[in-house]
Design a protein with these regions (language model features):
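Conserved GNAT acetyl-CoA-binding A-motif
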Residues: 85-99
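C-terminal "cap" of GNAT-fold acetyltransferases
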Residues: 99-100, 104, 108-137
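Short amphipathic alpha-helix that is part of the acyltransferase structural core
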Residues: 1-26
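A short, internal acetyl-CoA/4′-phosphopantetheine-binding micro-motif in the GNAT/acyltransferase core
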Residues: 63-70, 98
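Conserved beta-strand in the GNAT
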Residues: 38, 43-64
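Conserved acetyl-CoA pyrophosphate-binding loop and the N-cap/start of the following alpha-helix
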Residues: 69, 73-81
């Protein structure tokens, strides 16, 4: 298994990126300014993009695993890699997600309504607010 940084032609992984963020123009907002990593385990299985949000905050903007390989720990391996790589440079690792019943703390009201051109659904529930989860590094 190998995790490698992708510097060029990041859109070749668009099929993976759209698993986590289904609207391409939203992906375009962070794709080039972010640092992209792919996890290769006999082929690319997962990806993530992180951005520097200032004030010591590193944000996971996109993280996805191919459907046939989900729940096998690939995303966890990417997160562990990010923590190890960036713990000296940043004090917080955060990720934003939808307001599904399984998520909690910091909520940005109406994020999905205000920023997407169509309703976004997860497990049959329309996402409205953005929830931020943080880990101190």
């Amino acid at each position: 298994m190998l995790i490698q940084e992708i510097d060029e032609n990041k859109k070749r992984y668009l099929h993976l990126l759209l698993l986590a963020d289904e609207q391409e123009d939203m992906v375009d907002r962070y794709l080039e300014r972010g640092t992209m990593y792919v996890l290769d385990d006999n082929g690319v299985k997962a990806e993530c993009i992180v951005t520097d949000e200032g004030n010591g905050v590193l944000e996971i903007k996109n993280i996805a695993t191919l459907p046939d390989y989900q729940k096998q720990g690939y995303a966890r391996k990417l997160i562990d890699f990010l923590v190890a790589k960036y713990s000296e440079q940043y004090s917080v690792l955060q990720v934003g997600t939808g307001d599904s019943p399984l998520t909690i703390p910091y909520v940005v009201k109406n994020f999905f309504i205000d920023n997407y051109d169509h309703p976004i659904f997860e497990y049959g529930k329309q996402l409205i607010d953005m929830v931020y989860l943080q880990k101190m590094l």
